[in-house]
Amino acid sequence: MNRPSLAGAVHLHGFSRSFHGKQVLDDLGLDIAPGQFVALLGESGSGKTTLLRALAGLDVEARSSGTAVAHGNVSVLFQDSRLLPWLTVLDNLTLGLDAQAVRPAAAQLLREVGLADKAAAWPASLSGGQKQRAALARSLLREPHVLLADEPFGALDALTRLRMQGLLRRMVERVRPTVILVTHDVDESLLLADRILVLRDGKIAEDHALDLAHPRRPDHPAFMQLRATLLRSLGVEAEFV
């Protein structure tokens, strides 16, 4: 009997991580199904980015115990686009791959993110939003089973941020990777995710499933109710909810 593929599944069991004696993640247990879009919320220092970096195989010098596995190909999308300034946009996308073989797919992704005319451009000539679109295309060119996104739109202005959120959602619906998004923006998590986790003191304090069709409206009663719940759990006073 053929066993189902684990590609895209994420599994943590009894996972802890500390830096210089400070416990950041504490005995985490978590299962994420392939294709699920999960948002991580929490105050600064709650362990969101540490969890993401553990799944990406980073910070190996940290003291860790337990299991943290992201099955299949993993791509990471950072807040900083991390485009190399001495390479063109297209060459940044294909870096580390068989450039000749993936060039058609790279060109198609640039068209999909609205950068078809920027393939030969230098990163310094791009706006912040354009750089993040290029970074998203670069991540998806790797055909990831798991996409780890660490506040990828945090440095963008409000309008560009909304456009990028819509672009990410459309691209994810087409490619269907598992997505784990670290964000401080409650509305962003509600607009994009299928499941929202709240981290507190290195533990998963809350786990919310969202059963709202896309595109989502912030004035939908269920959206507003969960928004209020999440804001309160993050310490926002009732008068601001």
Curated annotation (Swiss-Prot):
Top-level taxon in the UniProt lineage: Bacteria
Establish whether keyword Phosphoprotein is in the entry: no
Q: Which GO terms describe its molecular function?
A: ATP binding; ATP hydrolysis activity
Q: Can you tell me where the transmembrane regions are?
A: none
Q: Where in the cell is it found?
A: Cell inner membrane
Keywords of the record: ATP-binding, Cell inner membrane, Cell membrane, Membrane, Nucleotide-binding, Translocase, Transport
List the EC numbers from the record.
Answer: 7.6.2.14
Catalysed reactions listed for this entry: ATP + H2O + aliphatic sulfonate-[sulfonate-binding protein]Side 1 = ADP + phosphate + aliphatic sulfonateSide 2 + [sulfonate-binding protein]Side 1
Pfam families in the cross-refs: ABC_tran (PF00005)
Subunit arrangement? Answer: The complex is composed of two ATP-binding proteins (SsuB), two transmembrane proteins (SsuC) and a solute-binding protein (SsuA).
Name listed for the protein in its UniProt record: Aliphatic sulfonates import ATP-binding protein SsuB
Protein source organism: Delftia acidovorans
* Biological classification of the source: Bacteria, Pseudomonadati, Pseudomonadota, Betaproteobacteria, Burkholderiales
